[in-house]
Amino acid sequence: AVGATTTLSNLIVQFLMGMCNGFAIISAQCFGAKDMDRLRRSLGNSLVLGLLAAVVLTIGGLVFLQPILRFLNVPENLLNTATQYVSVIIAGLVVTLLYDVLSATLRAIGDTVTPLIVLAVSVVLNIGGDLLLIVVLHMGVLGAAVATVLSQLIAVVVCAVYLWKKYEILRIRVDDMKLQDAGMLRNMLSSGLSMGFMSSLVNIGTLTLQTSINKLGQNIIIAHTAARKISEIFMIMFSVFGQTMATYCGQNLGAGKIERIRRGILLATGYTCIWCTLNIVTAYTIGDWLVWLVTGSKTPEVIYNATLYLKVDTLFYYVTAVICIVLSLIHISEPTRLRRIS
């Protein structure tokens, strides 16, 4: 059930995450320029705009969930459990949004360690929650979804308390949440939507394939799900570098340090290309073992198709890497039309 619908839930979650990282670019520019009033206002506006987007996606997702799942050709025997899983994930989008805004804001002011630690703790709690709710309480797929949302909720509380106590400059007031600055709103929406669509680009493509994949039987669904999970792990580095460079470039643009931006882009491109090469080597040497590790299946059809997916997919990672780095430059550019086109 999770495998047949994971692309849909990932699409929504990745869009929100990308959008929040786009908002944080404006915060990074304000921080680089040492304009703390605008920094607080950018955080307040990020929360308001993000919450509006999360509420719209939650309502729309819950209302149209059944038609979407049928459009994706989710097998009838998986439809009920798939509905339970995606419904909980969608219902928790506000929690997801709050974590994304807070962690992106911390990165925007140069604190990259805290979001990483909180994320690691959240992952451990998620795994522990899965074991408790699925293995002990026998809640099945519903338990997996609940564990995900609860672990994110804990991450939100930790981030909020840390941010409030550690950074007085980020203690927003009611006035900071008023959408009054037209220029800031325009830049935030342009950057946020651009980053949102970029972050969900792969999932948009995969979603179009899911309708056909779900018709090909259980083994192909398992193979595709396993390959996508491994591929997502491989591609985390591109997303991390893209988000980091967008924040880094925003800070240095605000501070007027253009040469540091050039140097950072070259280094990031080099590092991601090295990562691409390592992924290709991994796919062609131990790809089948990774598939077995993820699925626990020794079915030849599952192993062969998932490994083939990885071997073909990783060859094109260089293109993805360059796109993520270049877009980080475009997202800090002044012409908003260029951001939208990108």
Question: Each predicted region: which residue ranges?
Answer:
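Alpha-helical transmembrane segments and their helix-entry boundary regions
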Residues: 112-116, 144-145, 221, 337
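Transmembrane alpha-helix boundary and packing residues in multipass membrane permease domains
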Residues: 25, 66-67, 104, 131, ...
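Small-residue-rich hydrophobic transmembrane alpha-helices
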Residues: 2-59, 96-115, 223-287, 320-333
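Helix-terminus/linker motif at the lipid-water interface of multi-pass membrane proteins
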Residues: 1, 69-76, 132-139, 200-229, ...
